[in-house]
Structures are given as C-alpha cells and as structure tokens.
C-alpha cells in the first residue's frame, strides 16, 4: 500500500520487505505449499472425508512448522545474522507461517466447493483490516517495520485462530498416516516436476 512508503523511512520499509521475502521462503519450508495442488487433488480424492483431511493437513503443517522452529531455537544466533532481522520479527514470522496455511486450506476448500460469498467477505475483511491495524500501530508507535508487521500478524491471529479451531473441531484429525503420506508423496511428485 503506497501510504506506508510515506509513513515509514526507507530503511524501515526495506526491513519490512526483507521480512516479507524471508516469510515467503519460510512458508515454503514449513507448509510445503500443500494447500495448493496437493490439497485440490485431495478434495476430489477424499470427497467424503474433506473435514478429516483438512484437519490432518493442518496438523502436518503445524508439526513441520514446529520442527523448523525447534531448529531455529537451537541455532537462533546464526539465523538472526543470516536473515538480518531481530529475534522479535523472526518470532512473528514463525507465528505468521504457523497461522496462514489454515486460511489457505480454508480458502482452497471454499473455492473447491464454489462457496465464494463467505470467501469474498473474509478476503475483504482481511484486506481492510491489515492496513488499518498497521496504520493505527504506526501512528501510535512511530513508523517502524515492526508496527507494520504487528498489524498484519495481529489480523492473521484474529482470522486464522478461529479457522484453525473450527477445522480441527470439524475434522477431529491431527494425524493420519494415510493423509500425511499421500500429501507428502504428491508434494514430492509436484516438486520434482518443477
């Protein structure tokens, strides 16, 4: 959003864009982007078990994110130097990487089942709340990258936590050997094709 280039210094805006770049890489590592092609294929394959599959994929993503976070915790000093970001931003990055796949799974399911009305409402809500929350935080606490990031992560928490709870309650499946194996095999075949 162009307004943030005016409210934040060049250095702070640069830090924010570095954060976004590393977040994309972290999200690939922690979610394996299972919510893309793999998830769509499974929606067709497991037509009667979509809730269970969705919650199991969410569980797999949480386990992978937890494993990568544990690795980070043991080597945090090394990663802070490589990423050139403070620990607080890296922790927010992990929180966002933990939460955002739930929204992606939910959105993918809505699209697959042609339920666009609620998807559009949630998308518009997020599109409005992200800059508003960030603007408020930047105005109150100064034009820092941390305030911009806190605004986005705060909105992610408000939207994604209820989705995570809803999907786990509905699917009641954290681990499924069949679903996890199928997802990882599909992911391997997709990634090797790229």
Positions of PLM-derived features:
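Structural signal for membrane-spanning alpha-helices in multi-pass inner-membrane proteins
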Residues: 1-5, 28, 72, 76, ...
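Interfacial/gating helices of multi-pass transporter permease domains
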Residues: 3-25, 145, 181-189
